[in-house]
Amino acid sequence: ADKKIALVGAGNIGGTLAHLIGLKXLL
């Protein structure tokens, strides 16, 4: 369960970073 939470948290962080990078590219 702890590993799942860690993976989900890392996925959310990665998604947020990818989203921010995408916004920078558009701007």
UniProtKB/Swiss-Prot annotation:
One of its GO terms (molecular function) is L-malate dehydrogenase (NAD+) activity. It catalyses: (S)-malate + NAD(+) = oxaloacetate + NADH + H(+). Signal peptide: none annotated. One of its GO terms (biological process) is tricarboxylic acid cycle. NAD(+) binds at residues 9-14. Keywords: NAD, Oxidoreductase, Tricarboxylic acid cycle. Its EC number is 1.1.1.37. It is an enzyme of class 1 (oxidoreductase). Belongs to the LDH/MDH superfamily. MDH type 3 family. Catalyzes the reversible oxidation of malate to oxaloacetate. This is Malate dehydrogenase. It comes from Rhodospirillum rubrum. The gene is mdh.
